[in-house]
A protein has these predicted regions:
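Hydrophobic packing positions characteristic
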Residues: 1-163
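Intrinsic low-complexity, repeat-rich intrinsically disordered segments enriched
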Residues: 152-183
């Protein structure tokens, strides 16, 4: 009798916890740059009360996070494409009222509809992470173009033939075969 009661309590607690979402990897389906929101497909599956595993539904109007100051005067923006990885965080409060400046916060704690996408979570590490770590630098890359900032060097590079480097009191400019060094 007591074992049945304990099992029922465990089942009830588990059912309640199954409805609480904290974070899960996701994949961008589409991105609206003007609104900075996306449709995101969470990865993985959830278990229904009958035991069946089902894929999570797509989530619409997910705010996408970029590094920026609260004044939005300083920010790092980059293209968001279908298939890009992200981490979905599920807010304790409804985001619609917060985004519109309202104060009506319905009780939807950790609901799938209150997701925020943090970009940059990928299945495989980016090879630039090791270079940034080794050089104690910030590296920004867009295909063949890159900018690197470290304590002793600034490098802007479009490709192997076009770059500008500031290092050790010297500025080097290269465009094709033409190299200009300033000291």
């Amino acid at each position: 009798m007591i074992q049945k009661f304990v099992q029922q309590i465990k089942n009830t607690v588990q059912e309640s916890l199954d409805g609480v979402h904290t974070c899960i990897p996701g994949e961008i389906v589409s991105f609206d740059a003007a609104k900075c929101t996306a449709i995101v497909k969470p990865t993985g599956k959830f278990k229904r009360p009958d035991g069946q595993k089902v894929a999570y539904p797509q989530i619409a109007q997910v705010p996408v996070h970029f590094q920026q100051s609260s004044s939005q005067e300083s920010c790092i923006c980059f293209p968001v494409k279908p298939g890009d990885g992200c981490l979905l965080l599920f807010s304790e409060q409804a985001l619609d009222a917060w985004r519109s400046g309202g104060e009506d916060f319905p009780d939807l704690k950790h609901d799938l509809t209150n997701a925020i996408a943090i970009m940059g979570v990928c299945r495989q590490p980016n090879e630039l992470m090791q270079e940034a770590q080794d050089k104690d630098a910030i590296i920004i890359r867009q295909k063949d173009s890159r900018a690197m900032l470290s304590n002793d060097e600034v490098l802007l590079k479009r490709n192997d033939d076009q770059f500008m480097q500031m290092k050790g009191g010297e500025i080097t400019l290269q465009n094709g075969g033409t190299v200009l060094k300033l000291t």
